[in-house]
Amino acid sequence: MFILGLTGGIGSGKSAVSDYLGKQGITVVDADIIAHRLTSDGSPLLITLKKALGDWVLDHHGRYDRAAVRARVFSDAQTLDQLNAIIHPAIHQAILDELDCSRSAYTILSVPLLFEGRHKSPNLLALCDHVLVVDASNEIQRQRVAKRDGHNPTQIQAIIDQQISREQRLDLAQKIGADILVNDKTLDELHQTLDILHQKYLAMAAQHGLK
């Protein structure tokens, strides 16, 4: 199996990339989607989170309150560590299960914090045979997130600050030989670039299968 790691800052356009390649028949294993599924209403993981952290992790409907949790962990490192200790192993196992089920020519593993977790356990970067980094300027990131999520500038900056800087991400990408896709043009132009990259990854996957 050839695994293509997909990462990038918030608002860079990772979903646009994975959605398009998914339409080409490529399996996409998305860590964010898995995390949402695992914390859905009444899930075992949500029950565990409530017991470990308290009722504040739920909204008044009994659903996982992502906004409240996000606000809390920004200023509370201990709670963040507790949260990660519960969620990350479950997400990692679900990722491994989905990867094992993939039968497409190559498989995309989409992880927003792929580089940030490289020195932690589990290290999802170690699963990847190659990496595609989606890049956009900080200003474009802010504009896209504000339009998509309705966050104010302070909230957006807080999210960006949880990630490594754009400069660090690009430096790491170059060091490991990752592809860097600058996503600052139209959707049609993005798709044209992805058509080229898709053929490249098909060839890389075929070569990988011969080893």
Annotate the PLM regions.
Residues 1-33:
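Walker A (P-loop) phosphate-binding motif
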Residues 24, 53, 126-128, 174-176:
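Short, structured coil segments at secondary-structure junctions
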Residues 27, 33, 130, 177-179:
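Well-ordered beta-strand positions
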Residues 32, 83, 108, 156, ...:
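Residue-level signal for inorganic ion chemistry
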Residues 33-106:
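ATP-dependent small-molecule kinase phosphotransfer cores
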Residues 46, 50, 138-146, 153, ...:
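An amphipathic alpha-helix signature
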Residues 93-100, 109-144:
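ATP-dependent NMP and nucleoside kinases share a basic, alpha-helical "lid"
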Residues 95, 103, 120-122, 147-211:
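Small-molecule kinase domains that catalyze NTP-dependent phosphoryl transfer to phosphate-bearing small molecules
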